[in-house]
Amino acid sequence: MENKKMSVLKQYKPFLAGLQLPLLIAVVAAICSSIITVYGPTKIKEITNLISDGLMTEIDLEAVSSIASFLVILYVIGIILNYMQAYIFSTSIQHFSKRLRTAIAEKINRLPLGYFDRHSQGDTLSRVTNDVDTAAQSLNQSLGTVLSASFLLIAVLITMFGMNWILALATVVSTLVGFAAVSVIMAKSQGYFKAQQNNLAAVNGYVEEMYSGHNVVTSYNAVDTTKETFAGLNQNLHDSIWKSQFISGIMMPAMFFVGNFSYVLVVIVGAALALEGHISIGIIVAFMVYVRTFSQPLSQIAQGITSLQQASAAMTRVFEFLGEAEMEDESHKERQLTNMKGEVVFDQVAFGYTPEKTIIHDFSATAHAGQKVAIVGPTGAGKTTIVNLLMKFYEIDKGSIRIDGVDTKAMKRSEVHDAFSMVLQDTWLFEGTIRDNLIYNQTGISDERMIEAAKAVGIHHFIMTLPDGYDTVLDDTVTLSVGQKQLLTIARALLKDSPLLILDEATSSVDTRTEELIQKAMDRLMEGRTSFVIAHRLSTIRNADLILVMKDGNIIEQGNHEELMAQGGFYADLYNSQFTEDEVEE
């Protein structure tokens, strides 16, 4: 248990660096404020005794006025100290949450793609946004309150026992029942708050998944099924929220009851002691104030601990994310290639997304500089996986991949990525101008070069029909077809002008005219570059220098189109079946 606590503190430590002094000042301010709060009733006791004694003779109004003025000054100082500690705690927590978000953003870039294969986008998004926000809000609302209330509770106890131990004992004993009840409730609340965060992540993930595939859901008439599934997830979220909020809701009433019970008990015991002459009326009045002061921090601590447990549940999920295994640190690696030619060699490559299942078994192939290499095969053959390995999105299990004779294991991922221009089947455009999308993360791109690339893929004319041309902002008001989006991503890849090019089914979702336009542009612009093309439509890669035919993670045939057709093997069957299908469609 001790090691676990140390581990938690170790996780928090880097996010609190530089905040120790402000937090220490806030703690000192909270202690001073607590002392002022408990010191005030002693002066009220003096005023009460002056008044009660003066009823028999004459009230010393000057003394009463002097004490009252002192109390006003004292409480003003207390207000200032309370504001100071609240401001410091709030500011420090915002710095803490900002650092946490920064750490998460940096962590995402260091995670292997395998993490995102195992976790839904909704779950990851929930950890980055909801969990951090929940932790920040809960800490902001409760941390300062719990600390201040704790100091006040200690100060009140010391003062009460110093004034009269019998009344102090009556006050403390009357609250033990409340503490016992609250302890039982708090023991159960942590699980409910953690379930709330997990269920919220599940709902977010499902909603994101269903909205992204809304057309498919509708076309398969799966709306009712989707509603039922969402209703189940939503009910789970409702139940966990209800339980956690119910617990939060009964905390304050329970503590108010304890406070009122203590108040009545102190009045009864105090009256009995006063009748016997053991205490003055002023002490009873002071204790009546102390009972309220004593029950208030108890209520605040109970409610604050509930919020802290909610923050703890959220922080657990955040630290789980930050504790995920990262990609290999490559800061020690130096740049390996200067004048890249573009020769790529796969040497007995083996890979599996999980240790139990190997996808690529013994992949060997050579792509000479400037060649157009096509990778074909049925769905699940491992075509896209080969591209992922080539881009070093995943680390291979066995064998090697060499670019110009250099093993990619010796190269930084950023160097490998710089070597490639890439066009994926799933286009990605962000909200920004067309210009920003085309020259994404590149410098020194002139307007002339950008326009030339747009013309090369046949998208320039469309761009110029838009109100602001290349400065048109791509948002919900601008509707682009699948083909237009794909042309923009191809133009972006051409502008990168890398020696290696990857086209992952780049023309499989566009019309015939657009496909021909893209194909001509790509044939012209792939000259002198080593290109890897993955396409289900074999008619688009007939002019490839080398065609690698894959099945079940292995190369079963290789050669150019004419050679493979002459062999009459798997490729020929695949090509002829597609050719027949095209004729039927026509």
Spans of features found by a protein language model:
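Transmembrane helix-loop-helix hairpins at lipid-water interfaces of multipass membrane proteins
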Residues: L23-L81, F161-I166, G277-I281
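Helix-loop-helix
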Residues: D53-L55, D60, T159-V173, K243, ...
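An intracellular "coupling" helix at the cytosolic face of ABC transporter transmembrane type-1 domains
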Residues: A17, L113-G114, V132-L139, L143, ...
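ABC-type nucleotide-binding domain
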Residues: E330-S331, L337-E586
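Juxtamembrane loop-to-helix connectors within ABC transporter transmembrane domains
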Residues: F89, I93, N109-L153
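Alpha-helical transmembrane segments of multi-pass membrane proteins
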Residues: I35, L74-I93, N140, G144-F151, ...
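Membrane-integrated ABC transporters
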Residues: M1-T37, S52-I67, Q85-F89, I93, ...
